[in-house]
Amino acid sequence: MSCPVIELTQQLIRRPSLSPDDAGCQALLIERLQAIGFTVERMDFADTQNFWAWRGQGETLAFAGHTDVVPPGDADRWINPPFEPTIRDGMLFGRGAADMKGSLAAMVVAAERFVAQHPNHTGRLAFLITSDEEASAHNGTVKAVEALMARNERLDYCLVGEPSSIEVVGDVVKNGRRGSLTCNLTIHGVQGHVAYPHLADNPVHRAAPFLNELVAIEWDQGNEFFPATSMQIANIQAGTGSNNVIPGELFVQFNFRFSTELTDEMIKAQVLALLEKHQLRYTVDWWLSGQPFLTARGKLVDAVVNAVEHYNEIKPQLLTTGGTSDGRFIARMGAQVVELGPVNATIHKINECVNAADLQLLARMYQRIMEQLVA
């Protein structure tokens, strides 16, 4: 028996949409949405394709996602070519099956079924889709959100189809994400010969006490919704490669994944105070890739929990763990934001796959969420 969710997922996988190349995925989605009465606005920026689609008016529920995928790696290591979808033992294999073409297909099919049953729905149903989530994300959802905010576009609820589940679909729902702040720090010294240290100033030696103190800081203890803030050193570089040269500079890159207990400005102030305490000469560059956000219990979370309980007979965990997602941009619009998608065990891996039955279940969950919020 054919399944429209599986068929659409396979059509999307066949389009090798390596970020930010959409490879025709959005045209396929747009065609399906326009056929059921959606108005579609393309919002392309530079090399990235985005679209905003809506049907109806009033309180707005948007489904958000991305058509782009990460590179497949060594195609010879796949059980089947990564862009030729295949089903084995109930599992659908292909790059993007779980992240997140399966979710996109489930969203669109859910919308088709919802509109067929509720042609005069009272709220507004919308889609916000990008082709740049996996790469730089500079011209994707963030730019589309800026354009929507500039004209005071309404967005009350947003469901992001990222693969949130761990073992079975719906066992985990993400109702927030930690913030992410990266520090690119250069400590300046004076290069010289290792035999004449009095004529040089070793930045590695200078920075060692600072780094020791930095890694020992307990930034916070988290809260009911977030784990404690984490700081990790990601890269350290110094020296010329020669064993007789004292380096002139030390580069250190470290990243904070921070909770709502802190702001990026609080973190910056503490790091800068520590640098001054240790009397270091430095230059610093900060990159804030996302503020923390949280959607507490409310209409959207309740609708999502209800849908999962109805179709999978489990109570989902509400978590804020993991990396960042495009939900961080959408939250700026004041919307309640939740992530619900398939099992994430194989995302970005060789032989990425998803349980085909899970995608059918996901489409039913999405439809029930629509029925609770905008019918």
Swiss-Prot record:
Pfam families: M20_dimer, Peptidase_M20. Binds 2 Zn(2+) or Co(2+) ions per subunit. Zn(2+) 1 binds at residues 66, 99, 162. GO terms for molecular function: acetylornithine deacetylase activity; cobalt ion binding; succinyl-diaminopimelate desuccinylase activity; zinc ion binding. It is an enzyme of class 3 (hydrolase). InterPro entries: ArgE/DapE_CS, Bact_exopeptidase_dim_dom, DapE_proteobac, Peptidase_M20, Peptidase_M20_dimer, Peptidase_M20A. The active site is at residues 68, 133. It catalyses: N-succinyl-(2S,6S)-2,6-diaminopimelate + H2O = (2S,6S)-2,6-diaminopimelate + succinate. The keyword Metal-binding applies. The keyword Hydrolase applies. GO terms for biological process: diaminopimelate biosynthetic process; L-arginine biosynthetic process; lysine biosynthetic process via diaminopimelate. Pathway: Amino-acid biosynthesis; L-lysine biosynthesis via DAP pathway; LL-2,6-diaminopimelate from (S)-tetrahydrodipicolinate (succinylase route): step 3/3. Its cofactor is Zn(2+); Co(2+). Its EC number is 3.5.1.18. Keywords: Amino-acid biosynthesis, Cobalt, Diaminopimelate biosynthesis, Hydrolase, Lysine biosynthesis, Metal-binding, Zinc. SUPFAM superfamilies: Bacterial exopeptidase dimerisation domain, Zn-dependent exopeptidases. Zn(2+) 2 binds at residues 99, 134, 348. Catalyzes the hydrolysis of N-succinyl-L,L-diaminopimelic acid (SDAP), forming succinate and LL-2,6-diaminopimelate (DAP), an intermediate involved in the bacterial biosynthesis of lysine and meso-diaminopimelic acid, an essential component of bacterial cell walls. NCBIfam families: dapE_proteo, PRK13009.1. Belongs to the peptidase M20A family. DapE subfamily. HAMAP family: DapE (MF_01690). Homodimer. This is Succinyl-diaminopimelate desuccinylase. It comes from Escherichia coli O157:H7.
